[in-house]
């Protein structure tokens, strides 16, 4: 299993707009990507900071996720609300 933890900072005052788009992405990923075992958005204690937690069965599932229309379209839309680039950590499960 592979994991991804992506921390995003959102511009002040538009958190609700960001959350609406992000929740749409979460719903589409969970409904259509069988290789993705976890795709969840969390609000951090720090204002305007969000964390996506992701878990995939293999690299092919990660690649498939990144190639979807919903990831490309909604990811670009979320980018409009972000304050800088996301901090992404890629993980490999210890078996």
Model-derived regions, located:
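An amphipathic, aromatic/His-enriched active-site/gating alpha helix that lines ligand/cofactor pockets
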Residues: 24, 28-36, 55-89
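Short alpha-helical
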Residues: 13, 47, 69, 73
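Active-site-flanking beta-strand signature of metal-NTP-handling nucleotidyl enzymes
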Residues: 3-8
